[in-house]
Swiss-Prot record:
Keyword match Cytoplasm: yes
Classification lineage: Bacteria, Pseudomonadati, Pseudomonadota, Gammaproteobacteria, Lysobacterales
GO BP field: mRNA catabolic process; negative regulation of translational initiation; positive regulation of translational initiation; regulation of carbohydrate metabolic process
InterPro entries according to UniProt: CsrA, CsrA_sf
GO CC terms, sorted: cytosol
Localization terms from the record: Cytoplasm
Encoding gene, per UniProt annotation: csrA
SUPFAM superfamilies: CsrA-like
Species whose genome carries this gene: Xanthomonas campestris pv. campestris (strain B100)
Keyword list, A-Z: Activator, Cytoplasm, Repressor, RNA-binding, Translation regulation
Main location: cytoplasm
Name this polypeptide is given: Translational regulator CsrA
Length: 70
């Protein structure tokens, strides 16, 4: 596993198409923003595991900016 240190506002690249930006840090929570093409699926791990198990239907679209408050 690659481990990186980033500050708020700093970004890392995954390949040529995906960027991950640190949006904020509060206590032990880190908010990140991910910019990826629509054909690249981005899920929280627990949601991804549900999808893999077929436990429950998951909305087909990702929610962007669903919680922009700090």
């Amino acid at each position: 596993m690659l481990i990186l240190t980033r500050r708020v506002g700093e970004t890392l690249m995954i390949g040529d198409l995906v960027t991950v930006t640190v949006i904020g840090v509060k206590g032990n929570q880190v908010r990140i923003g991910i910019a990826a093409p629509k054909h690249v699926a981005v899920h929280r791990e627990e949601i991804y595991q549900r999808i893999q198990r077929g436990d429950e239907p998951v909305a087909s679209g990702a929610h962007h900016n669903d919680d922009c408050s700090d």
